[in-house]
Amino acid sequence: MTRINSCPAARVRSDSRLVRCDRREFLRFGLLPVAGLPWLPVGLAPAAETPAALVPLNRFPRMVQEFFVQQVRLAEQRSLAAKGSLKTKVDAEAYVRGVREKIRACFGPEPERTPLNPRITGVIERDAYRIEKVIFESRPGFPVTANLYLPKTDKLPVPGVIGTCGHSTNGKAEKAYQSFAQGLARLGYACLIYDPIGQGERLQYVTENLKSRIGPGVAEHLHAGNQQFLVGEFLGMWRAWDGIRALDYLLTRPEVDKHRVGVTGNSGGGTMTTWLSGVEQRWTMAAPSCFVTTFRRNLENELPADTEQCPPRALALGLDHDDFLAALAPKPIIVLGKERDYFDARGVEEAYARLQRLYRLLEAPDKVGLFIGPTEHGFTQENREAMYRWFNQAAGLPPVTGEPPLVIEKDETLQCTPKGQVAATGAKTVFQFTREKSQQLTARRGTVGGDALRRAVVEVLKLPARHGVPDYRILRYLARRRFPLPHAVAYAVETEPGIQALVYRLFPGPWYARPPRGASRAVLYVAHLSSDAELREEPLIGEIVQAEPASAVFACDVRGIGESQPDTCGVNSFHAAYGSDFFYAIHSLMLDRPYLGQKTFDVLRVLDWLADLGHREIHLVARGWGALAGTFAALLCEPVKQVTLKHALTSYAAVAESEDYAWPLAILLPNVLARFDLPDCYRELQAKRLRQIEPWGPMAGKEA
């Protein structure tokens, strides 16, 4: 991926000045506020604590990472077993058909093919080629800005290529991307390269001076893409659809040979080349650069990827990066990587080996290739030349000896719009489409309640069946933590293999052993971020302890917060939009187990454990993030007789219909608004004496 904006280490200071970072800096510093806003305070080290300060406990910071590694390894093993079972050409052909069906399941149905309404807003004449400034609509009112590089030749029609961009701020005008488009034109190709959503001339969240107020590229993708999940949309499909419609336009041009069309791109463009190979069969050749590896390598290396780079259900369906290219088999494909890339070259070689075996079975071993350049991430000259050689061979053109001399244009020269942004022309944004769909789903859904609501909750959260009573560990006695009661014991309740919910039991006197039986009523507090910290700092807990002196009092950290808050993906990255909490939330969607569903399952298993201890009546109290898991668990668990929620989200529709929101992906549920919304749950919980305290709207308490 190319640099978006400068963020060198030399600029990092201990004051509060703010900088913008590209994906490389995202990975180095692991920072972006969870609200999706682009500005980062550089001085992020916590202030020195007074001797009396207590640091929140976190004794299991690797638990979530190792759990996901295990889950993804199992998915990979199943996928490799399926690939290993292929023995004949017929087997391989059936496999290719199967992956195409699975990819369609991931990406969802294609939208309607509406008129492109193309227009050419300018032409740039150069020595051996010309550049046409093209705008077309991939969806009604949703313009795509593109440059069409056309060779000056009498040998028509020429092969065509769709060029996809990585996460460059200036999109199609980025030097490396101009270079491959111009290089192809000088070699006799027509190349249409277009701006991705949130980049170049297609910023989605603009200020009055037409700059991104969230941050171009990664930040805009995350902010729009996470929100889209609520209405059953996937940003990867939106970006792929732009590419499909770009191909539709390219094939209307008489200069282009419809039987010789390729697709290439680097980094985020390598992603789109890979996805487009999976969802579109008209390509005759493809060359993804600096993206293809394996999902397992990315996870084990703690490498976050954008929303659009993580297809929903992909891992659950047995798909890996190579499968999206296998969908195009046996057409010519070359996988381009880099030895010094953060996309692991070992995974590049593994993906290629899987494709190589498939192509051998398809009797086309020479139609798949591999090139790993010696340098770092980027569509540098060596990778571009490998792409040229491959495409010339596939298109029946003479061998390439090297890249022709290039002349790089200024960004402004390549702009298609008068002011350099489609926003200035009144274009619709991704958010506006999301808001409209949310409103449509709400009107269509109506009110949901009773057993229908409970079934919908189980199905949307993908909650597995619960069996038996969970085992637990008794951890070291907690002394002097300043809880509402003077003593506490922590129990690690095993909610599923590899996962423990950390549960504190408060006591008036010393206790070191298993929980006592006796009290029929218990209070269970489900924490927002840390039970340890909130038992000291949240006044609601103290109030309830005083109000219910006869009740046993427990507090719970579900997976991924408090005692198991991950320390992965960079220092202090947990709350970053590209950090560890997002990392596991997006992998959860690929595994088809929403992260909030897993957290809800933890609460349900803790409730099973409490029931086994003799607590037949539960007052469930929850705050913030924990209020969502608490809501669903209370809805599904009969022993919960009373519910108190503080800072619970008002509704998912409010998030879907607000351009600015601060709730993380871990709290958002895929396609939830097609089935129910939180007010349905709150209405149902009135029968359990629901008390709501200071509900939070889309900005999670950060409203101005």
Regions found by a protein language model. Name each.
Residues D248-A314, V606-A674:
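Primarily recognizes the serine-hydrolase "nucleophile elbow" in alpha/beta-hydrolase
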Residues P312-L325, Q356, R675-D680:
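Alpha-helical scaffolding within the catalytic cores
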Residues A48-V144, A329, L336-L502, L506-R521, ...:
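Alpha/beta-hydrolase-fold serine-hydrolase catalytic core, especially in secreted/extracellular enzymes
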Residues L156, G160-I244, L251, T294-E302, ...:
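Cap/lid segment of the alpha/beta-hydrolase catalytic domain
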Residues C7, R11-V34:
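N-terminal secretory signal peptides and thylakoid transit peptides that target proteins
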Residues Y149-P151, T164, Y194, T264-N266, ...:
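Generic beta-strand/beta-sheet core signal
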Residues V158-P159, L187-Y189, K258-R260, Q281-T284, ...:
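Loop/turn elements at helix/coil->beta-strand transitions in domains of secreted/extracellular proteins
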